[in-house]
Amino acid sequence: MLFAEFAEFCERLEKISSTLELTARIAAFLQKIEDERDLYDVVLFITGKVYPPWDERELGVGIGLLYEALENVSGVKRSEIESMIREYGDLGLVAEQLIKKKKMTTLAFEELTVRKVRETFDEIASLTGEGSMKRKIMLLTGLYGLATPLEARYLTRLILNEMRLGVGEGIMRDAIARAFRADPETVERAYMITNDLGRVAVVAKKEGEEGLRKMKIEIHIPVRMMLAQVAESLESAVREMRTAAVEWKFDGSRVQVHWDGSRVTIYSRRLENVTNALPDIVEEIKKSVKPGVILDGEVIAVKEGKPMPFQHVLRRFRRKHDVAKMVEKIPLEAHFFDILYHDGECIDLPLRERRKLLESAVNESEKIKLAKQIVTDSVDEVRKMYDEAISAGHEGVMIKLPSSPYIPGKRGKNWLKVKAIMETLDLVVVGGEWGEGKRSHWLSSFELACLDPVTGKLLKVGRVATGFTEEDLEELTEMFRPLIVSQQGKKVEFIPKYVFEVAYQEIQKSPKYESGYALRFPRFVRLRDDKDVDEADTIERVENLYKLQFEVKRQ
């Protein structure tokens, strides 16, 4: 497929606001794609992805490299490109204008194809070490040299993972279902166990719904993790379930462990491979866990038998060098509470049976443990378990329905959580503002947004400026500086990449923001770099928490 055909289709999508029309247009486009490799790439590219989230490959191309490539191909200086970004607010549109100027004097000698873009991306992702940056710039310059102005717009946005089409996972799922006459729920399940929409589309095209139903969980391909809803209270949660399985809720990082007898891989909640950062846990898994399993659990940092704050776990996850030193400095424990695979898929079994399989697969050790669990219909026993968890330094309890299956990616009432502190929100940072006085060289406030999971759009809910130390602001400024795509006065706009956990006094209705809601007195709690943008809290959750405030007040 010519990349021009893809770009022209994206331009048409950009003008459509109706979810139903977007779904129908994408479905019709997918039906026409004959080459399976093109189909795979187009599905990912439309959703702004180059690789599935669990794939360790990444382009490693920041705005700085794009500036250099665009400067090379257009002859326009970087300072002028930055000025154009302030005018257009979108590097994709800037690239389009730059290539438009260039193409007035240059004849294209080769047409760009989707395959060529994919092959170049794969080569860029493979580059490491000395000279890799120069080679990346050369390859990017080559792509822009072949691109038409419109192709340059969407090529740039794709590299930045921000297509601006309003097409989220939900729309693409429904489009695949419509294109290849499959049940959307079957497509959803296939996606949740593979986390690869491109692969799902190819199977749907080749084998139809029957092929999708045959797709099974595979060791070393992460499964989207099941999530919990917030319970109104311990009492209401137990009442709703009648009999409940109750476990401690840990203040750590969610992990999914895959162990086939020869290799262990560990994935974070964002489905990133964090195996190399956790060599101590890997070795203990090999000693304490039977092979042929996928386990769901939480890793916590411990000191003298007490849990340490969540940030310590993240320091372990982030560490790329001197890992052995960090193992000594921040010891970890893994607490497992579920099993997804035991010599075959077992997510459709009820929790009570999965727990038995889990117990048979894990021999507890100093670092590998089973989450403590009781099954009861007594509110008093649940309260006692909750108090024990808080006394031990944990967050609260998880209350689960013993008869429930494990539904990948699902947040529902089969799992409920009760925490000691007021519920917080995990929100995407989409903008910021430079400070004043001695803080003028730091970003001092950050604009926050929740996720519309259907369209993939980020809906603003407010701005946070409190809860930061000076060290926080210095570190966050360095993190966000490369992500700035436009600036008006002191206000800047970021490529969405990071998630903040934010506390607040209450949620209010507000016409000021596209979400329709605003946070009152928001306060920064911590950076959630264990969460991807797609894992941020949704507009539905904001609405539910807004309504829950009134339920609590009535009580």
Swiss-Prot record:
SUPFAM superfamilies: ATP-dependent DNA ligase DNA-binding domain, DNA ligase/mRNA capping enzyme, catalytic domain, Nucleic acid-binding proteins. ATP binds at E247, R254, R269, E298, F337, R411, K417. GO terms for biological process: cell division; DNA biosynthetic process; DNA recombination; DNA repair; lagging strand elongation. Coiled coil: none annotated. It holds the Pfam family DNA_ligase_A_C. One of its GO terms (molecular function) is DNA ligase (ATP) activity. CDD domains: Adenylation_DNA_ligase_Arch_LigB, OBF_DNA_ligase_Arch_LigB. Its EC number is 6.5.1.1. It catalyses: ATP + (deoxyribonucleotide)n-3'-hydroxyl + 5'-phospho-(deoxyribonucleotide)m = (deoxyribonucleotide)n+m + AMP + diphosphate. Its cofactor is Mg(2+). Keywords: ATP-binding, Cell cycle, Cell division, DNA damage, DNA recombination, DNA repair, DNA replication, Ligase, Magnesium, Metal-binding, Nucleotide-binding. The active site is at K249. It comes from the Archaea. It is an enzyme of class 6 (ligase). InterPro entries: ATP-dep_DNA_ligase, DNA_ligae_ATP-dep_bac/arc, DNA_ligase_ATP-dep, DNA_ligase_ATP-dep_C, DNA_ligase_ATP-dep_cent, DNA_ligase_ATP-dep_CS, DNA_ligase_ATP-dep_N, DNA_ligase_N_sf. Belongs to the ATP-dependent DNA ligase family. DNA ligase that seals nicks in double-stranded DNA during DNA replication, DNA recombination and DNA repair. This is DNA ligase. It comes from Archaeoglobus fulgidus (strain ATCC 49558 / DSM 4304 / JCM 9628 / NBRC 100126 / VC-16).
